[in-house]
From Swiss-Prot:
Residues 102-110 are intravirion. Interacts (via N-terminus) with gM (via N-terminus). The gM-gN heterodimer forms the gCII complex. Residues 18-80 are virion surface. This is Envelope glycoprotein N. Keywords: Disulfide bond, Host Golgi apparatus, Host membrane, Membrane, Signal, Transmembrane, Transmembrane helix, Viral envelope protein, Virion. The chain crosses the membrane at residues 81-101. Residues 1-17 form the signal peptide. Envelope glycoprotein necessary for proper maturation of gM and modulation of its membrane fusion activity. Also plays a critical role in virion morphogenesis. Its main location: virion.
Length: 110
């Protein structure tokens, strides 16, 4: 098994793992899990419309995107670290086995 095959296998495993985590962590309820409220015993009166609609202004909305800090308490951050480690290890093996040994062979044969 060559180093490029190992690197490709690690890459595919990383992608499949990410897709599995993304598919299982959507948190969206399916249509079978939703329940409709029961209307038994309620009169059919129309509900009053909204009295006033207030839209938030530009400065009323808070955003904390610039204060992101990684946390090791979530599964996704641990999974991202594992993926990064796999990429670093695969890159190391790729460089050592393909580039370095080709360089040594060229120097020895020249």
């Amino acid at each position: 098994m060559t180093a490029s095959t190992v690197a490709l296998a690690l890459f595919v495993a990383s992608i499949l793992g990410h897709c599995w985590v993304t598919a299982n962590s959507t948190g969206v309820a399916s249509s079978t899990e939703r329940s409709s409220p029961s209307t038994a015993g309620l009169s059919a009166r129309p509900s009053p419309g909204p009295t006033s609609v207030t839209t938030p202004g530009f400065y009323d909305v808070a955003c904390s995107a610039d204060s992101f800090s990684p946390s090791l308490s979530s599964f996704s951050s641990v999974w991202a670290l594992i993926n990064a480690l796999l990429v670093v290890v695969a890159t190391f093996f790729y460089l050592v086995y393909l580039c370095f040994f080709k360089f040594v062979d060229e120097v020895v044969h020249a």
